[in-house]
Design a protein with these regions (language model features):
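Short, well-structured N-terminal submotif of metal-dependent ribonuclease cores
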Residues: 1-31, 45-57
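Alpha-helix capping/helix-boundary segments
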Residues: 2, 35, 78, 98, ...
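A general alpha-helix detector
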Residues: 2, 38-42, 81
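Acidic catalytic patch
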Residues: 9, 33-37, 58-87
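Short loop->beta-strand "edge-of-pocket" segments that line small-molecule binding or catalytic clefts
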Residues: 28-30, 66-68, 108
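Acidic, PIN/NYN-like endoribonuclease modules and their adjacent C-terminal/linker elements
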Residues: 63, 71-72, 99-126
Length: 126
C-alpha cells in the first residue's frame, strides 16, 4: 500500500511510493479515499491508539500535502460499485473500494496488489 510505503523509509516500496505520491500534482492523479480509510483502520488494527493515528495522519499531510486535496469524494455510485465488486468479483472490501473509485475516474489503479489485474476495465500501474 502506497501510504504505508511512503510513511516508512525502511519499507521496500518506500522510494516508489513517494514517487507516486509526488505525481498527485499531475492532472488525473488522485489518492483513493478508500486508501485513506484503509490506512487508518489498519493502523488501528495494529494497536495504534487515536493519538498515534492522529500523528501519522498529521505527518502524512505535512510530508505529502497533496494527499489533503487530491482525493476524490466518495459517492453512492462508488459505494454501490464497491459492494458489487466485493460480492461478485470476490475481492476484499478495501480493494473493491479502490477499484470502484478507479472505475468511476479513469480505470487506473496504482498498486502492487495483483488482484486489480483480473478486474475488467482496470489497469494496474506500479
Amino acid at each position: 500500500m502506497i501510504l504505508f510505503g511512503a510513511a516508512d523509509p525502511d519499507d521496500p516500496a518506500h522510494v516508489r511510493s513517494v514517487a507516486y505520491l509526488a505525481r498527485l500534482d499531475e492532472p488525473g492523479f488522485y489518492l483513493a479515499g478508500f486508501a485513506l480509510i484503509e490506512f487508518d483502520i489498519v493502523m488501528k488494527s495494529r494497536g495504534l491508539n487515536y493519538r498515534e493515528r492522529m500523528v501519522r495522519h498529521a505527518l502524512l499531510a505535512r510530508d505529502y500535502p497533496l494527499t489533503t486535496t487530491r482525493v476524490k469524494p466518495l459517492s453512492p455510485e462508488i459505494l454501490y460499485l464497491a459492494a458489487r465488486m466485493e460480492g461478485e468479483d470476490r475481492i476484499d472490501y478495501f480493494d473493491a473500494g479502490v477499484a470502484a473509485e478507479a472505475k468511476v475516474l479513469d480505470g487506473h489503479v496504482v498498486s502492487t496488489d495483483r488482484v486489480f489485474d483480473r478486474l475488467p476495465g482496470l489497469k494496474r500501474v506500479w
